């Protein structure tokens, strides 16, 4: 997998993260959105967002999926590290943000991390036992499980560049097929200028944008065809230091209303 052509940057969150323990994009969303929900995080990278949803936001189950096996290994190590640092749970129904730094990094280095399988449940949803990570190419991955919420944060560009127009259509169709009725897609698409930058930076994509007929401003139409309807969008908080580079992208919240006309593409 050369030149991180799937967006599988191994230092992504250290490069882009701001000052907050919680990912600022999650802070934009309603507190109750993930509570007791089954969640799929497509392109989970090192599992930072997945682990926060499974712990602080009280999801019943979270599956983090990434095409890069090295990142999945990092995600499992990150989960072990994060859960080892969480302090005593005052309220069994939730883990609050300040508990995440309860045990200092120095103590973890001195006494080592606690393997996830040996840790007691830290909240009502059984964290850290309510989260799994899997190496898979989403377009070729099969699942019998459906999800209440699916996240696609800064991954649509990479799906599109690697799999072209047919791939992005299939991507949205497959997301719809994996969502429960009234399930929610949280989409953070990259803009067309980001495609052009990637094409200049990664040689395998040098000619790709000019061969694409679909651009990100057409995604809403494709998602409507897949049975997903835009509920609202969240504009970037450009003056908030917590957001750092994440401030440049809008998130779109879609809800599954029914069976889309491109559902058949998910089985081809």
Curated annotation (Swiss-Prot):
InterPro entries: Bin3-like, Bin3_C, BIN3_SAM-bd_dom, SAM-dependent_MTases_sf. One of its GO terms (biological process) is methylation. One of its GO terms (cellular component) is sno(s)RNA-containing ribonucleoprotein complex. It is an enzyme of class 2 (transferase). Its EC number is 2.1.1.-. GO terms for molecular function: O-methyltransferase activity; RNA 5'-gamma-phosphate methyltransferase activity; RNA methyltransferase activity; snoRNA binding; snRNA binding. Residues 23-258 form the Bin3-type SAM domain. SUPFAM superfamilies: S-adenosyl-L-methionine-dependent methyltransferases (SSF53335). Keywords: Methyltransferase, S-adenosyl-L-methionine, Transferase. Probable RNA methyltransferase. Belongs to the methyltransferase superfamily. This is Probable RNA methyltransferase C2A9.10. It comes from Schizosaccharomyces pombe (strain 972 / ATCC 24843).
